[in-house]
Curated annotation (Swiss-Prot):
The keyword Signal applies. InterPro entries: NAP-like_sf (IPR037231), NAP_family (IPR002164), p53_tetramer_sf (IPR036674). This protein is coded on the reverse strand of a histidine-rich protein. Gene3D superfamilies: Nucleosome assembly protein, p53-like tetramerisation domain. Residues 211-253 are annotated as: Disordered. It comes from the Eukaryota. SUPFAM superfamilies: NAP-like. GO terms for cellular component: nucleus. This is Aspartic acid-rich protein. It comes from Plasmodium falciparum (isolate fcm17 / Senegal). One of its GO terms (biological process) is nucleosome assembly.
Length: 253
């Protein structure tokens, strides 16, 4: 009888728990959609500023090549990439294209890049569905003979003496899922796009160095504090030993 009552109340409360939890999840979804709508509004307001910024960037030779290679996660790209990226005249991002946060990234190269590849405009469009990434558009690159940087990557990976892993940023232009490589799209949309000048000037590297230095400095301080505590404990032990010796001498007298 008691077991039956226990089971009844268990399922009764479990049923209402599930209902409440679903209501919470629905509110979370609604909140995410409203946040996305606000983000879209401000993205729209930023467009004229991004266009002005792009006009300035196009007057700086090699801006995007230097910006991309100075990002810590992209510092290991093969040198052949830099030769091609030096002709990258425009990088464009269309972000938050729907409520799931889909985005499109476009690389536009100058005419001199024809000696390496065609076409000169590379596009990758990524969508999300239930947190699953799906590539719905990706330009297929046609490399000129002997100019494919991915071939250089293959050579480096086969070199057992090469301790530094190398990869090509152009490997990202694929519909396949990349393993053990940075997600170029996420790096651009989340970090580089919003303030490329800081990467171009190498300021982000200094920030990381400062953070590492602060952590090491804090660790050293902790070690010094521990050493000081140990010294204080030793001094107290010495004082106690001295008092014990003095008491023993008095007793002997």
């Amino acid at each position: 009888m008691y077991l039956f009552i226990y089971i009844f109340f268990f399922f009764f409360f479990f049923f209402f728990f599930v209902i409440v939890q679903k209501d919470i999840e629905q509110l979370d979804i609604k909140c995410a959609h409203e946040q996305m709508n606000i983000q879209k509004q401000y993205d729209e307001k930023k467009k004229p500023l991004f266009e002005k910024r792009d006009e300035i960037i196009q007057k700086i030779p090699g801006f995007w090549a230097n910006t991309l290679r100075k990002h810590p996660a992209l510092s290991d790209i093969v040198p052949e990439d830099i030769d091609i990226l030096n002709h990258l005249v425009k990088l464009d991002l269309k972000d938050n294209m729907d409520n799931n946060g889909s985005y499109k990234i476009t690389f536009i190269f100058g005419e001199k890049a024809k000696e390496f590849m065609e076409p000169l405009t590379l596009v990758k469009h990524v969508t999300f569905d239930n947190n699953q990434e799906k590539v719905v558009e990706c330009t297929r690159i046609k490399w000129k003979e002997g100019k494919n940087p991915i071939a250089a990557v293959t050579h480096n990976r086969s070199d057992l003496d090469n301790e530094i892993p190398k990869w090509s940023i152009f490997e990202w232009f694929t519909t396949d899922e990349l393993q053990d490589k940075p997600d170029v799209g996420e790096l651009i949309r989340r970090e580089i796009w919003h303030n490329p000048l800081s990467y171009y000037l190498g300021l982000e590297e200094f920030d990381e160095f400062d953070d590492d230095f602060d952590e090491e400095f804090d660790d050293d301080d902790d070690d010094d504090d521990d050493d000081d505590d140990d010294d204080d404990d030793d001094d107290k032990d010495d004082d106690l030993d001295g008092d014990d010796d003095g008491n023993n001498d008095d007793n002997d007298d």
